[in-house]
Structures are given as structure tokens and as C-alpha cells.
Amino acid sequence: MLFHGSRHSPEGAQPRRIRGYAPGVTFTEPVDTPLALLLLGQGSDAGSERGVDCPGELPAASDPNLAARAEAAKRQLGERLFVLGHHYQRDEVIRFADVTGDSFKLAREAAARPDAEFIVFCGVHFMAESADILTSAAQQVLLPDLAAGCSMADMATHQQVLEAWDVLTDAGVADRTVPVTYMNSSAAIKGFTGAHGGTVCTSSNAERALRWALERGGSPDRKVLFLPDQHLGRNTAVRELGLGLDDCVVFDPHKPGGGLTTRQLRDATMLLWRGHCSVHGRFTAENVADVRSRVPGVQVLVHPECRHEVVEAADFVGSTEYIIRTIEAAEPGSSWAIGTELNLVRRLASAHPDKQIVFLEKTVCYCSTMNRIDLPHLVWTLESLVAGGVVNRITVEPTVAANARVALDRMLALP
């Protein structure tokens, strides 16, 4: 059983055995190519990141002292520094995190450390924005690589959502529609949501957020505009709230009127934004059937950002934290196929060698933008702080931050 890395790896890359995988299970390590990262990072040339030049000079990735340099910088900064690491980060980066977790946990951890002057967020852009919103003005949030964005978050721009709201207004349904935005969205979208009476949600509390939205004001014909991930919205509505698939319609911001008729907008309960996760959206029902045929007794565990047919075919569905807890509690000798980002799957396999843990898809799939945060960028960020410089600071405009904070606070107050 070979996990091929042909889409990401140069010809001749060697497969590597990972502890915790069943005998004979190998995969070829993906190698990030400048072209792939350029496209995902939205830069205009290979020397820029997200269209913004990277100031300073990065340490060479081949420097054998990178880890020691990171440790030394952390020691010098002491309590002034707090490093956050998302579960999807590389091993070389996650080892330096003071706290690991999903996006919302990390944002809350940042807010709980008012003594930390510098918060280095090893994640992606929207996560650093949320940390900036939830922390004090005296704290500075830094993102080691500005090209570490999120394709899903980028699928819903503020202008697109404003235009969508105009469509709902023209259809006569805006006054009974509550926006619910996934944590994986920009600060501008969270701000829109807060200003229009809505809330933020995570993959672990999406059910509570949707129930709150549909019950808001006691109106029996409430609607939800769920963005930017259609799959999480659909899976939660159908599996947790008991709605039918025909109660959900997809609003496509690239089509006039969202590609929907006025009747469709009025009849639907869930207006799902046409967005998805580039990693979780890759998994298919065929992947589930294939792994069941190859691994006897395998239990399939997937993230709710997966397509509805994948979630329906799986045995267990839950957030990143749920996936981790499920594997930790699993019986020794049990077999698992996990449908989420590869860095986390590999880390779980390594941490639980008494269980057979495999990636749901044969082709390896990292979150390429998350994977941009590497050790050279982390060392550059930390050493810049030691030298008295602040690089790649993430700040959210005060009005946007205030409205986004309203939406985040509504989530925290959910019953």
C-alpha cells in the first residue's frame, strides 16, 4: 500500500517508512515547489509572498543550527513571547509551540496570555487575525510567512458578501436571514456577520450556532446564510438538525443572483456559500470504499469539512480536536483511516504505534499554505524580535475588529 506523492514530489523522491503505519505502508514525502507555493500564496512572482515582499533575509533551510537558533531566541525572549501552533503545522515547527490546537482554541489561548508581548502564530492568516481581535492593543500578533493564507477563507470576500446581502434584500428575505460564519474566514467577514446580527462558529459548535440562528427572534421562517464552507453547513444542517438536502441551496457569488431564483431563496432554510476546504474537499466516497476493501476492520474518521457523501460513508465525524481524542481513546490494535490534513495524520500515527493509522486518500495531501510556515521563517521571526524588530505583524482595522468581536462574543455566549 503506497501513498503516492506524485503531485507534489520531484521525480526520484524516495518513499519513507513512518513509525505507526502498518508494515509495507510508505509514502513519498511531498516537496513544496516554488510554482505550487506561488499559486497558492497568490504572489505576483517567486520572490514575493501574497503580493508583498518578504523583508530581510531568511536563514538557509540547510542550516544545521536552525533548531538551536530557534531555541536560543525563545530563551532570550522568555515570557515576552508566546508561540501558537496549529495541528496542521510541520513537525519542525510544532515542536516550538507553547500551545497546540485548532484555530479557535489557539485564539482563546492568545487572549488568555495578556502578559505576552509577542504572539507568534504558526498557522494561517485568518487565525492570526482572530488572535489580534481577541488580544489587547498592547500585544502584537505575528505570522511568520504572510503567504500562509487559506483558500477557503479567500472564497468569500467582503464585497461578494455585501453583494449577496443585496440579493437577499431584493428577494425580501434579508430581514429573516442570520449570517453564521465559520471560524475559517477573514476578519472582514466576521465583522460583516457581527454587524448583521450573526455569530461565528467552529466545527465543534456549528450545531449550537445554527440552532441559535434559526431560533433567533422566534420567527418560524428564519434562514441562515452559512459561509464560507458549504460542506460544514450542509453536514451540520442535515446530520445534526434533521433538515433535508432540499432545504439547502448553494449561493454562488460568481453567478448573477447567486445562481438561484427568488423562489429558491425564499423556500430554502440554509443558504450555503459556494466555498470549500482544498484539503478536505479532495476526499471522496470512493476513497472510503477503497480503504475499507484494503484494510480489514478499518474505522473511517473524517472532518465535517468533507463532502456530504464522504461524511455519510464514514464511521465517525468531528473536528480536529475530536479526531485527536478519538484516536487517543481507541483500542490498541484498532485500524483507522483518517480524512484530514496529512501533517496531523502522520503525527497521530507516530504518537500511537499500537494502532494502524492510515491516510484516507492514496495521494498525500498537505495544506500547502499552512505548510508555508517552516523553520527558516520561524527562526527569522524570532531572531528579528530578539534584535528589536517586529516583522509580519497582523493588525485588524478597529471598526472591523469591533464588529468581529461582537460575532465572536456571541459564539462564546452560545448555550
Enumerate the language-model features and the residues they cover.
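Low-complexity, intrinsically disordered/propeptide-like segments
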Residues: 5-6, 42
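Active-site loop-to-helix "anion-binding N-cap" substructures in soluble metabolic enzymes
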Residues: 16-20, 24-339, 344-415
